[in-house]
């Protein structure tokens, strides 16, 4: 299958969703050589991936993941693509605690640093959260705490087949955008930040195809894969299978514009300190951007009827102490798990 797919893509033709899924199945089962995988990924990058192709890949990757079960009817994920090169602190990770603090269950999917100095797993570890949990421990955490971190390398074992080819070709491929589309807990509400404005509507259409109930796919002013304060951000809303594209202007909600530079992060320790200060109530542009992004998560999760109400609830989550309390609860719960509940690295 993969040989035919390579020939088709090299000739400039697109794969159907079914063809892409069949190729992904072959890759995820170890049936493709590293050279074939590298050739396909490079050819797809040069041609440009389509909604059909990304959907086919994501659907199979979801099926091959280690599935995490939850008692919650609604789960929010705030995982973005990364790759914006802006070097900001971990905005979506801080926003996840604000959403969870407001009572909306969060299944935060993420990894260690790939395209930045600090990934979500890195900053969570600095905050004291244990991330190396097996499926049963993640499920218990999600059901008891109402928030859990889903560490991608432990829940997407089949991705090991593509790690070598991706590393060796050293270019951005479709796999750079599959992570946020393949939450192992099947999160049905999302805030997904993308590094390119071109990807916003495309990935929104993919989420709609995959059956996500409510989502916002965003590309921030200044090139961020988050809603930013630098100006109006692209906002694509997924709702009931349809996609609506628009802009979110922070000034409309009373926020002052601020350059991306004021959101600068650093090492995992520095980013953890920034996140903790925000959750403890420090005011300023960094809090504002977290509240904005959390508001979208609250709307997607059904807690807020609109962005304005989401902003009020997000601010209350911080000011009431509930957001930082959720962090402390997660730290305590994961720290008390027995060694047997940690996955082998």
Swiss-Prot record:
EC number(s) on file: 2.4.2.18
MF (Gene Ontology): anthranilate phosphoribosyltransferase activity; magnesium ion binding
Keywords from the named record: Amino-acid biosynthesis, Aromatic amino acid biosynthesis, Glycosyltransferase, Magnesium, Metal-binding, Transferase, Tryptophan biosynthesis
Pathway in which this enzyme or protein is active: Amino-acid biosynthesis; L-tryptophan biosynthesis; L-tryptophan from chorismate: step 2/5
Cofactor: Mg(2+)
Residues reported to bind 5-phospho-alpha-D-ribose 1-diphosphate: 80, 83-84, 88, 90-93, 108-116, 120
Gene Ontology BP term (one): L-tryptophan biosynthetic process
Amino-acid positions noted as binding Mg(2+) 2 in the UniProt annotation, renumbered to this chain: 225-226
Recorded GO CC terms: cytosol
Amino-acid positions noted as binding anthranilate 1 in the UniProt annotation, renumbered to this chain: 80, 111
Chain sites annotated for binding Mg(2+) 1: 92, 226
Catalytically driven reaction(s): N-(5-phospho-beta-D-ribosyl)anthranilate + diphosphate = 5-phospho-alpha-D-ribose 1-diphosphate + anthranilate
Enzyme kind, highest EC tier: transferase
Annotated cofactor note: Binds 2 magnesium ions per monomer.
Binding residue positions for anthranilate 2: 166
Record flagged with keyword Magnesium: yes
Pfam families according to UniProt: Glycos_trans_3N, Glycos_transf_3
SUPFAM superfamilies listed in its UniProt record: Nucleoside phosphorylase/phosphoribosyltransferase catalytic domain (SSF52418), Nucleoside phosphorylase/phosphoribosyltransferase N-terminal domain (SSF47648)
HAMAP family linked: TrpD
Family: Belongs to the anthranilate phosphoribosyltransferase family.
Xref: NCBIfam families: trpD
Record note on quaternary structure: Homodimer.
Name the UniProt record assigns to this protein: Anthranilate phosphoribosyltransferase
Protein's organism: Pelotomaculum thermopropionicum (strain DSM 13744 / JCM 10971 / SI)
Gene name of this polypeptide: trpD
